[in-house]
Design a protein with these regions (language model features):
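Metallocofactor- and cofactor-centric catalytic cores in central/energy metabolism, strongly enriched
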Residues: 156-169, 176, 180, 190, ...
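Structured alpha-helical segments in the cores of large, soluble enzyme domains
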Residues: 139-143, 165-177, 246-258, 387
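Short internal beta-strands
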Residues: 188-193, 297
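Conserved core of the sugar-phosphate nucleotidyltransferase
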Residues: 198-361
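N-terminal nucleotide-binding beta1-loop-alpha1 segment
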Residues: 130-153
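"Short basic amphipathic alpha-helical interaction patches in structured regions
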Residues: 152-158, 203-204
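Left-handed beta-helix
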Residues: 2-135, 285-529
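Short helix-terminating capping/connector loops at secondary-structure junctions
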Residues: 132-134, 181-185, 259-264
């Protein structure tokens, strides 16, 4: 049996708890589309209502039912819970009807006044409210990623980012500080994948936490439309359907009920690689005082964020719009900073009691993101859902604009250099503070720095960037101790040459390297890059 959504307990949070979803094998082989796979009568009735109201003819429904049968069979044989099968059918039906799942530009409008609350408008008294409400809080970190974009084969959260501390080590310090600050044993939950679990557990052997696994669903063979088959490695037939699966995983694993039974009513969720996403008690206080069901943190969009998800108005609701939901001819508009001014940090706050009530009606009907992939030469499709898309599923959900220092992602080695540099002051409690008010520097590294291993060989000591606005490094360059970049700097090393930098300051210049390896600094000229 493969990984089902389940809970593992590491440490002494809730001794004696034997939670976890016990899988069952459904006896519904060759299932017609009659909801035979759903055992709960009330849930089956809701499923049938959903099916009957689909905007399809009888012939189209028959074709769709035939198409879905193979997936229902495969999920059933994998002991998948009813709600996951329903949600998979729901995603595939959306894909069947819309195919590309793009939102027409004509249906999109910008946010209106009042759609987003400025963090600065929240009164300081909410800190006290949040501290009192902290006994009802749990913190969850999304820890399923391998960091493949940086050539990392292990969990991204185990990359060293400051001295000997990894992301997870710093998160552990942040949680320790939070517990001391509030006086409550706030649980830490890690949403792991089968790719990250073992390495994470080995690293965190001394820290108590809860482990939650996502569901997995079958990949779609693009050519046949059937579940993808891989004879080399059956694991490659499956994938986790995006962070939007968290909501169902919480329910079917048993964790949602257990948290509620333990008096936990709020869950703060963020990416493990975003060390700026500490638990801010003022935000918790606002959620508690206003009885908000769902709250998303957004931040002002910059040129570096133009590909990130943004908030829009669609069908009179505030919705999340991801790049994958945008037609190619609309991408320029999507990236227009004047029209779409904020983007999603993927940090959300969830009222667990309201989530439970909502899920008793069936899975959240979240937008579907089509993610094309290639596995061993076969073109496949993954249907995914975004965590933040749930903002449209809750009446009374809000977005709040937070300071930029609450969003410190690491997607590339350029991000890693910025995080490791002195641009951020790393406090003992694990929090980060920009050392300068200059704004976020732009850092561009060439292919020689593109993977973590090569980066670590070249960046022996992180450079000083606290007075930097723009840095571009091209070529085979090694950074040793006491290297500073200030203002705008572009250093280009020709092929077949290697430059070692140590105890050197570069300020507002373009650096050339001659055939003898000597550096020559020319004054910075705009657009000289």
């Amino acid at each position: 049996m493969r990984h089902a959504a389940r809970v593992e307990i590491h440490g002494a949070f809730w001794n004696g708890y034997s939670g976890g979803w016990v899988g069952r094998l459904l006896h519904a082989i060759n299932i017609p589309m009659n909801a035979a796979f759903i055992r709960d009568p009330a849930l089956r009735e809701r499923y049938l209502t959903w099916w009957q109201t689909l905007p399809l003819s009888d012939a189209e429904k028959e074709a769709l039912a035939t198409h879905l049968t193979a997936y229902i069979q495969k999920l059933s044989l994998n002991n998948s819970p009813d709600l996951l099968i329903w949600n998979t059918c729901q995603m595939m039906t959306t894909h069947f009807i819309q195919h590309e799942n793009w939102i027409p530009e004509s249906e999109i409008s910008a946010l209106e006044d009042g759609d987003v609350i400025p963090f600065e408008s929240l009164p300081d008294t909410l800190e006290i409210v949040g501290k009192q409400a902290a006994k009802h809080l749990a913190v969850l970190k999304l820890n399923g990623g391998l960091g493949t974009t940086m050539g990392c084969s292990g969990p991204k959260s185990l990359i060293h980012v400051h001295l000997n501390d990894t992301f997870i080590d710093i998160i552990s310090k942040q949680m320790h500080t939070l517990r001391q600050q509030t006086g409550h044993a706030i649980p830490l939950i890690l949403l792991n994948s089968f790719n990250t679990s073992d390495a994470t557990l080995a690293h965190l052997s001394d820290m108590p936490f809860l482990e939650l696994f996502q569901h997995e669903v079958p990949r779609i063979d693009t050519e046949t439309g059937k579940p993808y088959v891989c004879h080399r490695d059956k694991n490659l037939e499956w994938y986790p359907p995006g962070h939007g699966d968290l909501y169902l995983s919480l329910l079917t694993s048993g964790m949602l009920d257990t948290l509620i039974q333990k008096g936990i009513g709020y869950l703060f969720v963020s990416n493990a690689d975003n060390l700026g996403a500490t638990t801010h008690l003022k935000l918790l206080g606002h959620m508690h005082e206003k009885k908000i069901p769902f709250m998303m943190e957004v931040t002002p969009k910059t040129l570096t964020d133009i590909k990130g998800g943004t908030l829009i108005r669609h069908q009179n609701r505030v919705c999340l719009l991801e790049r994958a939901q945008v037609a190619p001819e609309f991408l320029d508009t999507f990236e227009d900073l004047a029209r779409f001014t904020v983007f999603n940090t993927n940090s959300v706050w969830i009222n667990l009691d309201i989530l439970k009530q909502r899920l008793t009606q069936g899975p959240l009907k979240l937008p579907v993101i089509v993610n094309p992939k290639q596995v061993h030469g076969t073109h496949v499709v993954q249907l995914e859902q975004a965590l933040g898309a749930a903002i449209e599923a809750f009446n009374g959900a809000v977005a709040i604009t937070v300071p930029r220092d609450r969003f410190v992602p690491v997607k590339t080695t350029s991000d890693l250099m910025l995080l490791q540099s002195d641009y951020y002051t790393k406090r003992l409690d694990g929090s980060l503070q920009p050392a300068s008010q200059r704004g976020l520097p732009t850092v561009i590294l060439s292919k020689e720095f593109s993977n973590v291993s090569a980066y670590q060989q070249r960046v022996v000591y992180p450079p000083s960037l606290k007075h930097c606005d723009y840095l571009r490094l091209d070529g085979d360059i090694t950074l040793l101790d006491r290297v500073k970049f200030e203002g705008h700097v572009h250093l280009h090393v020709p092929p077949a040459q290697h430059v070692v930098l140590e105890n050197k300051t570069f300020k507002n210049c373009r650096v050339r390297v001659d055939k003898h390896g000597q550096l020559h600094e020319d004054p910075w000229v705009p657009d000289s890059t």
